[in-house]
Amino acid sequence: MELTRVTAFCPGHISGYFLPVIHDDPDLSGSIGAGIVISEGVRVIAEKSADSTVKIFQTDRYGLPEEIAESSPVLMDLLAYMQVNASIETFCHLPIGSGYGMSAAALLGTVHALNALYNFHLSPRECARIAHRIEVQHQSGLGDISACQGGGFVIRKTPGPDGDIMRVIDTRPIYALTISPIKTSSVLSSHDMIAQITQSFPSRIPQNLDDIMSLSREFAEKSGLISKEIRTVLTACDKENLPASMTMLGCGVFALGKRAETVLKKFGEVFKLTISPGGPAILFGERSS
């Protein structure tokens, strides 16, 4: 009996700092930088169907879903690229467009779900390559797919899913606050912004999670991306000596350590996150009777 329905999960990713690397070959395009693969992400349900459809859901902190989009150009292009028809539903556990890598998680999770559903026998790296090509094409991101292939806090030394990536696990909690979304493509398509980001990129490799937090903050300060709303939150964190920076690319803040929750909750809903120990996974599949 063949599979008719597959559920997959992919963790999200908070980028602390990044440097776009653009190449004519999308496999060699992407970004270098550092970030954190987080425990929350996107659950994907893929079901065989005569026609392709996509629905996007946002779940609240209780897991209750709300449909927020009846289609997705990115996922529809993915289905066409993989030459399959399927009904896709994605359930995002964190706000979209807010620096949590939900777009990448939905994309990579969908590739893994379709791989299992249609028995393509693609390796995890091959799945990541497909997702990365679609991500670069749509400018929905440049480095999140590469990061979300596995867990840990991540240092991407070279671009793309085949790049040199270092991963280390840390058990300390991370707390995040979202103020408003930012459209990633609006930043990636701005030549002036890319030039400023390039000048702000750290000149050394971080040694640990604390170092990533420090370099992320330096990058955020130099890049000119910090808004007045983010500045207010960061100042409050600074007064409590909390390592904190801006979620890239999103209008929000992430901070390290248990005390961060008390500070951040003064400004809105706070998400408690942990570092994910791994990347995408197939949760279960249903077979025809």
UniProtKB/Swiss-Prot annotation:
GO terms for molecular function: ATP binding; kinase activity. GO terms for biological process: coenzyme A biosynthetic process. It is an enzyme of class 2 (transferase). Gene3D superfamilies: 3.30.230.10. Optimum temperature is 40 degrees Celsius. Keywords: ATP-binding, Coenzyme A biosynthesis, Kinase, Nucleotide-binding, Transferase. Its EC number is 2.7.1.169. It comes from the Archaea. Optimum pH is 8.5. Signal peptide: none annotated. Pathway: Cofactor biosynthesis; coenzyme A biosynthesis. It catalyses: (R)-pantoate + ATP = (R)-4-phosphopantoate + ADP + H(+). Phosphorylates (R)-pantoate to form (R)-4-phosphopantoate in the CoA biosynthesis pathway. ATP is the best phosphate donor. Can be replaced with UTP, with lower efficiency. This is Pantoate kinase. It comes from Methanospirillum hungatei JF-1 (strain ATCC 27890 / DSM 864 / NBRC 100397 / JF-1).
